[in-house]
């Protein structure tokens, strides 16, 4: 256990290939498990929550998990809690899935609007209309890696370096090398 007074960190990487990592239930469960190990205060709250759900034999609802997280964030005198949601755009955006991206966005909006004194959030995502619509009004600080000037230039520099320093560079005609560079930059799509 960590002592009270030290910051806590919980992160969640959204992954469309893993059902447990693309929705609200997985996100909340992951945050709570990580926080459980970081402070005696968190331990007590989460252990009580676990006991209320028959020691894990009765799965909690998403609403119950969200309320437990809010209870942790409301504990008095705690140091900052950093919650990181990485690759939010990988959360499924289809209503047939139990917990969709819209539910995760709703939770983020709710947590930010509640203005918990100790909450710090970082959300990463590719630009998507539904995500931008919810997050833009909430953002205190935004860093875009999708602008044409920065990331694309880095990718272009790297591709040129690799092709121009390749041992078989002399085998290619200059126009073919330039065409290969142009196609690779275009197809990289910022990745």
Predicted feature residues:
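Conserved NB-ARC/NACHT P-loop NTPase core of NLR-like innate immune receptors
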Residues: 1-191
């Amino acid at each position: 256990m960590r002592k009270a007074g030290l910051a806590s960190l919980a992160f969640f990487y959204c992954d469309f290939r893993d059902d447990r990592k693309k929705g609200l239930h997985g996100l909340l469960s992951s945050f709570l498990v990580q926080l459980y190990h970081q402070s005696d205060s968190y331990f007590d709250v989460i252990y009580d929550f676990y006991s209320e759900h028959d020691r894990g034999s009765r799965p909690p609802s998403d609403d119950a998990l969200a309320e437990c997280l809010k209870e942790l964030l409301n504990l008095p005198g705690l140091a900052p809690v950093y919650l990181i949601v990485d690759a939010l755009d990988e959360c499924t955006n289809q209503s047939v899935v139990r917990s969709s991206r819209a539910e995760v966005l709703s939770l983020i909006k709710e947590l930010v609007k509640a203005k918990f004194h100790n909450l710090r959030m970082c959300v990463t995502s590719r630009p998507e209309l539904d995500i931008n619509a919810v997050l833009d009004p909430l953002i205190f600080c935004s860093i875009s890696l999708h602008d044409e000037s920065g990331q694309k230039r880095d990718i272009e520099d790297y591709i040129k370096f690799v092709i121009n320093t390749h041992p078989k560079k002399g085998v290619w005609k200059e126009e073919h090398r330039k065409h290969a560079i142009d196609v690779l930059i275009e197809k990289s799509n910022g990745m």
